Swiss-Prot record:
It comes from Pongo abelii (Sumatran orangutan). Homooligomer. Interacts with EGFR. The gene is SNX16. Pfam families: PX. GO terms for biological process: early endosome to late endosome transport; endosome to lysosome transport; protein targeting to lysosome. Belongs to the sorting nexin family. Keywords: Coiled coil, Cytoplasm, Endosome, Lipid-binding, Lysosome, Membrane, Phosphoprotein, Protein transport, Transport. PANTHER family: PX SERINE/THREONINE KINASE PXK, SORTING NEXIN-16. This is Sorting nexin-16. It is a peripheral membrane protein. Residues 27-40 have a biased composition (Low complexity).
Amino acid sequence: MATPYVPVPMPIGNSASSFTTNRNQRSSSFGSVSTSSNSSKGQLEDSNMGNFKQTSVPDQMDNTSSVCSSPLIRTKFTGAASSIEYSTRPRETEEQNPETVNWEDRPSTPTILGYEVMEERAKFTVYKILVKKTPEESWVVFRRYTDFSRLNDKLKEMFPGFRLALPPKRWFKDNYNADFLEDRQLGLQAFLQNLVAHKDIANCLAVREFLCLDDPPGPFDSLEESRVFCETLEETNYRLQKELLEKQKEMESLKKQLSEKQLHIDTLENRIRTLSLEPEESLDVSETEGEQILKVESSALEVDQDVLDEESRADNEPCLHFSEPENAISEIEVAEVAYDAEED
């Protein structure tokens, strides 16, 4: 048989003044007294063997006015034959005179953050409840279903005409089924909403002890509370590291895009520079070709001039040559004739 569960609360955003009370005499709800850290160590020390499951719960902590105007909540439990209704409507007198209600006299709706299955000696489930007294002061307490049941019994004795409709027990099926635990968590959340929806119930001693309203726990009151505080820091560290990794991936992607854009810009600049240099090169080529054409034309003119000079010289020279041979022949003939005449 498991010993009574000792709650292990953890503050979130506590002010310095909340640590001044004497915490050595703080008692848990309904007879479970925390005498030392060793008494609860056996129940929560091996929490890593359990399976802690966080489920999404609507955040109703900051809007206290929604408690009075919230509709009827209907929850159907796994294996149950009928649905159970959880009413969050305020008392009739408060509905008639809403302006006279002092919202500071009651806490905001506690939120069940999740549950954890403990398997140290006897297997059981604890529910992690976030209690927010003010926007600046909040803490976490751990409660078993047995603690909720004891609170419901006490409230029945104190308020006989009021029924909070606690989710029923489950006798012959697996109490650690995930679907069943989620349904029970929803029912317990509606139960807590009913607690704070009525001023008299929210301010009674049983509820204040259940939520530790008069003696908010500190993060280092016991070994278990320190463990929960360290786990919260680890979760925060993991979340921040995950965000940092995502930012680094995004930065690497942006760097890659930037390098691609820069390469594209360099390519365009080189292309523009090439296009701007092509007209100058064509102009240089045309000038060179023009000079070569001029040189060729001048050379051709020189050649033509030489040819004309040679032709003119050739026209003058044949007259002289033809006249001289005629004279020579006549002389030869005269000489031959004269010689022959002498021989005769």
